[in-house]
Curated annotation (Swiss-Prot):
Belongs to the universal ribosomal protein uS8 family. This is Small ribosomal subunit protein uS8. InterPro entries: Ribosomal_uS8, Ribosomal_uS8_CS, Ribosomal_uS8_sf. One of its GO terms (biological process) is translation. Part of the 30S ribosomal subunit. Contacts proteins S5 and S12. It comes from the Bacteria. Keywords: Ribonucleoprotein, Ribosomal protein, RNA-binding, rRNA-binding. The gene is rpsH.
Length: 131
């Protein structure tokens, strides 16, 4: 069993992108699906699909590459960890990497990107960053 399913999912995506794989498979969790929704909306992944096989669910993530075959994901990091939670206020979420990156934030309005959190005037737990 994985202790930190978010960190495991981010590592699987990072490793698959470095190896230039077409897709990768992640363990299923609602929080992971919410994070993938943000990645999809921001254009960091092509698509994802929840697979139910023998009563166990998993997620297939199709990675996205540019026309030269390079991954659109330069770096992906876990910010808030189980031993050290990191919270960001509204003003700390305005821009990240000059708008090229996104901080995924768990707020009272759900799991959203940093720009949406800034516009909604909410802060929350910074789950991960991607650029």
């Amino acid at each position: 069993m994985v202790n930190d399913i978010i960190a495991d999912s981010l590592t699987r995506i990072r490793n698959a992108a470095m190896r230039r794989l077409d897709y990768t498979t992640l363990y299923y969790a609602k929080i992971v699906v919410s994070i993938l929704e943000v990645f999809l909306a921001k254009g960091f992944i092509e698509s994802y699909k929840v697979i139910d096989k023998d009563g166990k669910q998993s997620i297939n993530v199709v990675l996205k590459y540019d026309e030269k075959g390079r991954s659109v994901i330069s770096e992906i990091k876990r910010i808030s960890k189980s031993g050290r939670r990191v919270y960001k206020g509204r003003d700390e979420l305005k821009r990240f990497k000059n708008g090229y990156g996104t901080i995924v934030v768990s707020t009272s309005k759900g799991v959203i990107g940093n720009e949406e959190a800034y516009k909604a005037n909410v802060g929350g737990e910074a789950l991960c960053s991607i650029w």
